Amino acid sequence: MEPWSRWKTKRWIWDLTISTLVLTFLFQAREVRGAAPVDILKALDFHNSPVGISKTTGFCTSRKNSKDPDIAYRVTEEAQISAPTKQLFPGGIFPQDFSILFTIKPKKGTQAFLLSLYNEHGIQQLGVEVGRSPVFLFEDHTGKPTPENYPLFSTVNIADGKWHRVAISVEKKTVTMIVDCKKKITKPLDRSERSIVDTNGIMVFGTRILETDVFQGDIQQFLITGDPKAAYDYCDHYSPDCDLTSKAAQAQEPHIDEYAPEDIIEYDYEYGETDYKEAESVTEMPTVTEETVAQTEANIVDDFQDYNYGTMETYQTESPRRVSGSNEPNPVEEGFTEEYLTGEDYDVQRNISEDILYGNKGIDGRDSDLLVDGDLGEYDFYEYKEYEERTTTSPNEEFGPGVPAETDFTETSINGHGAYGEKGQKGEPAVVEPGMLVEGPPGPAGPAGLMGPPGLQGPSGLPGDPGDRGPPGRPGLPGADGLPGPPGTMLMLPFRYGGDGSKGPTISAQEAQAQAILQQARIALRGPPGPMGLTGRPGPVGGPGSAGAKGESGDPGPQGPRGVQGPPGPTGKPGKRGRPGADGGRGMPGEPGSKGDRGFDGLPGLPGDKGHRGERGPQGPPGLPGDDGMRGEDGEIGPRGLPGEAGPRGLLGPRGTPGPPGQPGIGGIDGPQGPKGNMGPQGEPGPPGQQGNPGPQGLPGPQGPIGPPGEKGPQGKPGLAGLPGADGPPGHPGKEGQSGEKGALGPPGPQGPIGYPGPRGVKGADGVRGLKGSKGEKGEDGFPGFKGDMGLKGDRGEVGQVGPRGEDGPEGPKGRAGPTGDPGPSGQAGEKGKLGVPGLPGYPGRQGPKGSTGFPGFPGANGEKGARGIAGKPGPRGQRGPTGPRGSRGARGPTGKPGPKGTSGGDGPPGPPGERGPQGPQGPVGFPGPKGPPGPAGKDGLPGHPGQRGETGFQGKTGPPGPGGVVGPQGPTGETGPIGERGHPGTPGPPGEQGLPGAAGKEGAKGDPGPQGISGKDGPAGIRGFPGERGLPGAQGAPGLKGGEGPQGPQGPIGSPGERGSAGTAGPIGLPGRPGPQGPPGPAGEKGAPGEKGPQGPAGRDGVQGPVGLPGPAGPAGSPGEDGDKGEIGEPGQKGSKGDKGENGPPGPPGLQGPVGAPGIAGGDGEAGPRGQQGMFGQKGDEGARGFPGPPGPIGLQGLPGPPGEKGENGDVGPMGPPGPPGPRGPQGPNGADGPQGPPGSIGSVGGVGEKGEPGEAGNPGPPGEAGSGGPKGERGEKGEAGPPGAAGPPGIKGPPGDDGPKGNPGPVGFPGDPGPPGEPGPAGQDGVGGDKGEDGDPGQPGPPGPSGEAGPPGPPGKRGPPGASGSEGRQGEKGAKGEAGAEGPPGKTGPVGPQGPSGKPGPEGLRGIPGPVGEQGLPGAAGQDGPPGPLGPPGLPGLKGDPGSKGEKGHPGLIGLIGPPGEQGEKGDRGLPGTQGSPGAKGDGGIPGPAGPIGPPGPPGLPGPAGPKGNKGSSGPTGQKGDSGMPGPPGPPGPPGEVIQPLPILSPKKTRRHTESIQADAGDNILDYSDGMEEIFGSLNSLKQDIEHMKFPMGTQTNPARTCKDLQLSHPDFPDGEYWIDPNQGCSGDSFKVYCNFTAGGETCIYPDKKSEGVRLSSWPKEKPGSWYSEFKRGKLLSYLDVEGNSINMVQMTFLKLLTASARQNFTYNCHQSTAWYDVLSGSYDKALRFLGSNDEEMSYENNPHIKALYDGCASRKGYEKTVIEINTPKIDQVPIIDVMINDFGDQNQKFGFEVGPACFLG
């Protein structure tokens, strides 16, 4: 046998083997996934047009190679279609994984179920809801997933009035929706592993059972297939694009090709039916020859391109390997059969067979997604389930070499394809500016174009020789339906009927549902149509048509490009002098301007010394713009400016004159064909263009009936130009046509908009100055002008009204202290203020006279143990030397030796207080006195407050206390001012009342032990110190470091009284304490010398406007100030906002095209345009310029106490006020219970000076010191380290007073000085026996002042009671605040704290102190024992009488129940008539309890009288809890029968008497024993009845609120709309709130946004970005809501209100200027629609919320000022009220918006 014969025989056997294998695999693949899809429309008999179904045009109006459009069905709301599920799934098995495929066009804006599948129990198992937010409902036999887990595709909107191809794939636990073959969304589907869908029920089309919403719209195809991958191929296999032919033979012309292989499937697209027709078997398998295979190579590639099952990124997980066309075995088996086994249906095999038999199609090379590297062997088909398992094909020689997708076919031409050129770069978008587009006349005919490329592929060639026999085809799809059969049996559901013969069947809810199912299953007799057939194959491209006749002159074209700028025109004539422009509006605050004009003279201040010449300050803030001046003369024309940057694209200019004809362009090379774009929306017809050469076939238009070709008619007139349509997709480039003849000149176009201004003309000559015009409207803000000259001082204006509170201005410079005013009259005591922050410590005052013995203070905390000093006897008291001038700081001196011991002097009698002497100059420091002998060691005293040693400050005079003024409301705390200069000491005032104890200060650092102090007299018993034996007096040790704070020791016993020590030396000034609040003003200090100029401080925040003060007297006219330096010219301010658009001028003639000029100089301001229409209500404007101060207004009323302000900075120490009048002494209150230990307080404010103490023991006179002369002013040195204390020197002899030295710099504020010497000890009281707690007494008057102790936790404010006995020893308290200032001693170093002296004798009554701060709420005290009952109180105020209820019908008499507890006591009635038998029992006076038992809360009632209105319980106090009823008192003598009830003729029902009489008849006289109790019972019953009436029919008042307005309307249908109180949680009515009830709308409950959320005015918002939430704006915030009284609403109440609500609505009004709010007419979309944020933080928009509607959409057209009203009416209550809004359409030059937020209304 010849070699070629052997090879050919082997090859034939090989081909047969391959074919057999392929057919075997295909057959198995069909078994796996080849089940025919279920055609729902066919099963439901849509093609016979049941009720509510009609035929209409479908998805494609025309298809390639098809005359007729697709047929779809229009479904209206009358359609009621259903069928048994088994009719659709005859096998009774619904696939576990499946695809639902449908092509629909729902009615715009609808949302309804397209398919509902129920099981035999009436439970919906499957549903597809389509519309604005599609939902896939699935519930298997286990009830999974639950409804809240149904997949919701909220980002998809298929109810937009357009056709959509939707495929849903359900595989395992995911559901994927593919819309229009592009958008793919996958959601989890939480179903069971083996979920089952029952097919024993029915399927309902277009709705759900018992639901009113039905599907309305068009549907073309509706399939369910058991292949979950079919959804991915929906647009390839089931519903191809309109420009593709069906991949099977066209079903619209059914025939069987003579070459058709077996099992070619014909898909009919006529109306969504699938005709499964098997072609006749071809008996002979065609032989595949080499020629056929060679021809087939391109077809296989091309046809596989049509079955691209996803992009490479989706399915290809590794790059394909390049495989050469080697002779490897089984290429088809490896390359294709794997794909077929995966379940891909018939099309791939069909195309292989079809192309082998029909001839080939040229390879295209433009769409091959699967060809990556160029050879055919690089096809990688993967099974869908196994994306990672790659099977590589190895092509055999018989397939030939593949062609790479990248290859350009320029060298070869395969089957008539022309060479494709490379695609050119995309051109820049044209920018046509006004004046640039000048349309010329048509040019002359151009030269003939270049030879065009070869045409598109021609028709298929003749059939080739019969090929080898192909493999057996797959089994065909089921055949077409047969004739309708006889009516089938109805679906019978076995129902269990209950009841007997006389009663109808008992129907359960499920059976009723199933009956509804049966009613909807009545249209199950006719056979439904099948699915649509496949699209036909694309037809050949037609050849070029003949040249058309010359067209008529076209309409005016669009404006041409802007011409080159022409040369400047001739100089214009001088214009007339224009009128001055109108004043501009207030601009935005500019940059800091130059120095402003001098303001009006203020009130003259106190004459001060001339200060230093100030340095030049930094540039100040901008001044307010001045009024516009008269327009200046025109300046000379400036030099030509440099060229500016290209301006923005301008408006379309007027049509220019035609330009010369241009040269014909070179023909472009045909680019490759681009991918098919989506079909754009149908545009409106554009203007007719000139006839062009025929282009390639465009997108199919709507298919009309094909008429016979008519003869050419006469030339018609050009029609009117239509509106421009939307840009369609770009067509393929056509061939270059020949240039046509020049057309006739078209008519002039319409007047275009005004073009850009031309170049600036030459300056004209000055015109004649015109008359001054009237003042125009206020223009917009101009730039800030330069500072003008100072104007003349104007006349004093009249007194203006008090203006509203301005915004906080910057902090002004500190003013000088004014003169001290006369004390005003004492006002009434104000309310007690809140606890203020402790003030700064004051300067130490002089030692006052000895105070009276105070009450025992609270025990202080244990201080640190001081070093034990050597007790000396009291030395002689030296005379006080004159205060010397402050010297410079000396070096640390050595510790002096102790002085000689002095003798103790005797106590002198207390002398009378001396008159106030003049303030002497400060004397020099005395020498240390001689050391005294050691005295007896006293018991350990309380440790003192060791302070860190500061520098010694000047001793100030103590000013007299001022009179108590009216306690005003607590003002906001001001910011801390700088520390002022220290004033001269004032003279000591008379003693003031001791204030309340200050809060404890923080513990200071431990100070060094001071010098040895003089022993004092025995003090009161101190608290026991730390335990330890007392040692002998040791020598003074060196100062130790500060120890840590030790733990609090146990409470010690009272120590024995120590001797009284003399006053120690004044301690040094300590560190400044924490800043306290500003104290009351002190007296005016002497005028200090001006300090040096400080640096410029930062501008403080504006202070809050205080109340209007009293008008001060007019001061003398001040002398004119010096002229200030002229300020520098400030920088130009910011650009003002754009002015109103002027009127359009007439169009100018087109200028010659000149070169682009440089930007000219800015022209002068134009005149203001005419006044525009009334604009919409604007927001509040920016704050206007601050006006000049008017004269003082009238005295305002005293305001209410304001809220506490923020803590201000420390102000200057004010002058001390004059002494106030002494207040009356109140009785001493009882000791309070010990409060819990409070936190350490801050340092207390300076207390008033106490009365002068008794004279101390006389000390030995020291040697006189020499008088020091006034030293020079010392500079303030740095604070040095604390030196060790020196021993006290002997006092010097009083020297002559030195001269006053110059005033030094202000020193730091010192701590208060040490306390003065304690008074003599009083007798120690014994612990009294605790008495019974009495009733709360009336608050006592304030007691005499006690020593400052630690403030306990504030108790409730009470008046001071009478003095109680001294209490037992209290717990050890925390360390107290530093005491009041001690007497002025000679300056020395701080000594150790001496032992506590005994209590002094009670002093005279002190003056009343300034009211202290309000304490915080203390813990409630223990409950006292019940006191004896008081006398019967006066009757309480009558309660609010409820509205009388309607009179009820007479009820049946009830039995008398057990005697209940006594009810609320009514108001005492008039005395009743005495009974005939016996006198009534005596009225118990005074509520003395009867002997029979304990006293109940109410006393025994008085004699019954006729009922008055129900009173409140008690004597106008709050109602307490009801107590147990007391035992009844002894019964009075019996009254006549029935008389008990007579006093209650109104309150008691009529049946009561009869009922009582019947009981009396049965029970005899026993009932009379309870006459008093019965009246209380009936009163209680009546009260209960009224309460129940109020609960059933609430009145909507604050005390009787309703749950919602709907409840109120149901209770009182005649109530008008208005404001009512509601309490949704129905608890205590104290949390009720007031709402607006809209009964007209059905009882809506409405709440309102707060003032700042009501809306914003129309503005351009230049600094904000579109697409931002309003809360992110600089001036934005989240929207919040209040009740109608402006109070915030409790969150719990809002939650209850929403629980009681079925739907809620809220309106939102968007005010716009050229800005869209909802629908955009220009783009035809909702892309820029508003978005809202609901209260549940859920975003609401057009796409995801069908409950938002535009009631009026004026902003859609973007024309001028309009508004859009949007209503959110939703059953999702949590979305309302909205709390934020996103605005998307603003930012352009003319766009503005504002909005108004309406109330949120809830309807129950």
From Swiss-Prot:
Region feature Nonhelical region, mapped onto this chain: 229-417
Compositionally biased intervals (Basic and acidic residues): 805-814
Alphabetical keyword list: Calcium, Collagen, Disulfide bond, Extracellular matrix, Glycoprotein, Hydroxylation, Metal-binding, Repeat, Secreted, Signal
Gly residues composition bias: residue spans: 539-548, 581-590, 1040-1049, 1160-1169, 1481-1490
Cysteines engaged in disulfide bonds, as pairs: 60-242, 181-235, 1605-1637, 1646-1801, 1712-1755
GO cellular component terms, semicolon-separated: collagen trimer; collagen type XI trimer; collagen-containing extracellular matrix; extracellular matrix; extracellular space
Region (Short nonhelical segment): 507-509
All residue ranges annotated as the Collagen-like domain in the record: 440-488, 530-584, 581-639, 607-664, 641-698, 746-804, 1391-1449, 1442-1492, 1481-1539
Subcellular location, principal: secreted
Region forming the signal peptide: 1-34
Region span, Disordered: 437-506, 526-1560
Subunit structure comment from the entry: Trimers composed of three different chains: alpha 1(XI), alpha 2(XI), and alpha 3(XI). Alpha 3(XI) is probably a post-translational modification of alpha 1(II).
Protein name in UniProt: Collagen alpha-1(XI) chain
Organism per entry: Rattus norvegicus
Gene (name only): Col11a1
